[in-house]
Amino acid sequence: METRNAVSKDVLAGELEEARERTRLLLKSVSEEDLVTQHDQIMSPLIWDYGHIGNYEELWLLQKSHGKVLSKRELYDMYDASLHPREERPSLNLLDRKDAELYLDAVRKAVLETLEDADLGDGKDPLLKDGFVYNMIVQHEYQHNESMLQTLQLKKGEGYKPESRVELPAGGAVEEEMVPVPGGEFVMGTDDHARALDNERNAHVVDLPGFLIDATPVTNEAYLRFVEDGGYERPEFWSAAGWEYIKEERISAPKHWYQPEPHSWWTERFGFDEPLDPAAPVVHVSW
């Protein structure tokens, strides 16, 4: 076995494991009821995401890459996002937590076994070359971690307390003056085959006019000034479609913001109420 392949395989196996640890940590404190409930019509039940993670891994790292199949056709169909829109997924005969964990473990065991003999060199298989398909699966699992967090933010009832969390360092002063970026040519995209998806390739030169940009994301404090200055009542700040949406939905502030009393702003975060953090980046403003 080549040293380059052996090292890359160790890295790939470690990244697959790290992604799985995050997924399980994310779901560990979620109740069985919350796991199977569809908390919003635009989201899947969490248990569907969990099973889909394993089935997608089987599809790409076993079936398509090595011609190995563990599951019956019914399981592939059940976790195929193109066959079942989100409104259908709660009615499917989904794996429960225990069976999903057993399934994910079985898939991962087979994946690591086939990884040992996989040719990640300059072979003819574009999926295996440089470990592309393994990196794709790691990214896919993290994408569903994000979807799960969206679901947990949208769910009602008992608040979500993660098993553990990383405390962020205290922020410093925010520079509100915009930074000028001179125009000119720059390289957009990448030629990296191992980790970039097709919509990120290939590298190409783009000529961009000069522009101004904030040095940091817009903070809650800055956006609150826009809200209190009547920004949601002035159509000149919005596109036609955005203004129509604001009027139809009667939106007057970012989602989850509310005022328990005048001049006091709070937000609901994963089911818990907390004062609006002025230094945090504003979120939930897209339509």
Protein language model features and the residues they cover:
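Extended beta-strand/loop cores of jelly-roll/beta-sandwich
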Residues: E2, V7, V11-A19, R24-V30, ...
